[in-house]
Design a protein with these regions (language model features):
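C-terminal substrate/ligand-recognition segments
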Residues: 1-43
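Enrichment for repetitive, rod-forming helical segments
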Residues: 15, 23, 49, 109, ...
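Long, intrinsically disordered, low-complexity segments
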Residues: 1-6, 42, 57-170
Length: 170
């Protein structure tokens, strides 16, 4: 049927890299292993220039290189004075370099929303999904209810197990 699980080796590498970076290393493996894993994935894209494939721990732990922003036209399309533009950098995102790598590797694979929810803005409990403006979402005026951070349980799962409780807000 159409419910085939799809999991790439690159996904496993990135999951391990994120864990190592968040924990500061684990079980004898250092944060450098995280950088090596991301580099291994990038080598596929940079075969002709392996130097470009190499990433460092500092780059992964640094801020995002994306210029997060929201652009909205308030009038006639094409007239510059009708645009509301809110742009802000991503240098305050924890593990922003890793978030960038996830975006590049898994573009159009339906990872981004959950990544933006999982990653936080440094020094806050605010996730990037609600804390930054992007595409057609203005962070100052368009707040998504935090219950949307997790998905509802399917009705079939609830019907099949009476001990399950629906996630809050659904």
């Amino acid at each position: 049927y159409d419910d085939v699980p799809f999991f790439r080796l690159a996904d496993a590498y990135f999951i391990k890299a994120e864990c190592l970076l968040r924990l500061g290393g684990y079980n004898g493996e250092s944060e450098q292993v995280a950088a090596d894993l991301v580099t291994a994935v990038r080598q596929r894209a940079f075969k002709s220039d392996p130097g470009k494939a190499t990433v460092t721990v500092a780059q992964l732990k640094g801020g995002s290189r994306y210029n997060y922003g929201h652009r909205e036209n308030q009038g006639i399309m094409g007239e510059a004075d009708n645009w509301i533009i809110t742009e802000e950098g991503g240098d305050d995102i924890e593990l922003g370099g890793l978030l960038d790598e996830l975006a590049w590797e898994f573009v159009a694979e339906h990872h981004r929303r959950q990544d933006l929810i999982r990653f936080r803005i440094n020094g806050t409990n605010q996730n990037v999904y609600n804390g930054k403006s992007w595409f057609c979402k203005d962070a100052k005026t368009d707040k998504t209810d935090r219950h949307c951070d997790i998905f509802p349980l399917p009705k079939s799962a609830l019907d099949g197990n009476i001990k399950l409780k629906q996630n809050p807000g659904y």
